[in-house]
Amino acid sequence: SLELVENRFLDIKKNKIEHIIIDGSLGNSIVFGKEISNHSSNFSKFIGRLFINNKEVYSNFADTILGDPLNALLWYFDQKLRLKKYIKKGEIVSLGSITPLIWIDSPCNVKAVIDDLGECSINFIN
């Protein structure tokens, strides 16, 4: 999936993390690819790649997400249980980002690919 964020700060690096979290601008929308079935037991070795206008701009292993994306899922489950809350059927859980935040400031096509899992893309226009 691709996570869409808004840049509502003049200089995001000069803001306290608490203000950014409260604003909610960094968790705005998600673009999904096609649903797939994968029976891998080693999600941390998947490689995520980000392309802008068909040029690869970043790649990294999924182990950047707490050492293994499943660790992020376990953390989420633990937090829900600690708060005595439940995960609802059909709830979507995004586990984190393999790539860094990249600001888009002009029309382009952005594609995210996770090797052996699939891809999704979005076109930004004026």
Please annotate each region the language model reported.
Residues S1-G67, L73-L74, D105-N109, L117-N126:
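Catalytic-core "active-site belt" of small-molecule-metabolizing enzymes
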